[in-house]
């Protein structure tokens, strides 16, 4: 269970809501609430990897240790069993490992500092990963609970995405 001031749902409920939100982004149903994520979704080549990453992103929650690191390791074992290619498996593992990174940078760091953007870009490494991480992060945050996503968070996420995309 992850009931606290921030989370309104159990991990499994959160995961299913996040997958539904991801679908809403893909179909355009959330265009007003998540315009940048909706805009970049058609450009994403690794949609299957994105959905699997969303399914598995909190798989290690509740275990002792860093759930992102542990979940990335689980993905390396599970993804091939699901029929994903080596490249898709690596993408899923990378997304799970870094699924908290974009929100952490956007909400806690100075986005006007070029070093912040350069450091983030060096981890992301490609436009495809940037798009994947943006969409995953938006869906993950929106699935935490009602009224968690707001204009301030949307603006910071957009600013980080656009700044990194320009690098």
Positions of PLM-derived features:
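Alpha-helical bundle cores of large, well-folded domains in eukaryotic cytoskeletal
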Residues: 1, 16, 20, 45-47
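Non-catalytic interface/linker regions that flank or bridge core catalytic/transmembrane domains
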Residues: 1-7
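Divalent metal-dependent catalytic cores for phosphoryl transfer on phosphate-bearing substrates
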Residues: 10-11, 37-166
């Amino acid at each position: 269970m992850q009931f606290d001031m921030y989370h309104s749902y159990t991990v499994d409920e959160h995961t299913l809501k996040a997958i539904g939100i991801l679908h809403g982004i893909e179909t355009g149903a959330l265009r007003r609430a998540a315009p940048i994520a909706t805009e970049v979704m058609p450009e994403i080549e690794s949609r299957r990897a994105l959905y699997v990453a969303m399914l598995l992103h909190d798989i290690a929650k509740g275990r002792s240790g860093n759930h992102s690191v542990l979940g990335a390791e689980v993905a390396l074992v599970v993804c091939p069993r699901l029929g994903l290619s080596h490249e898709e498996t690596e993408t899923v593992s990378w997304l799970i490992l870094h699924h908290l990174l974009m929100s952490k940078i956007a909400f806690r760091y100075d986005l006007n500092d070029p070093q912040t953007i350069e450091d983030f870009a060096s981890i992301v490494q490609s436009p495809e990963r940037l798009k994947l991480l943006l969409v995953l992060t938006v869906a993950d945050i929106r699935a935490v609970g009602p009224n968690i996503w707001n204009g301030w968070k949307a603006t910071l996420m957009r600013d980080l995405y656009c700044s990194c995309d320009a690098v």
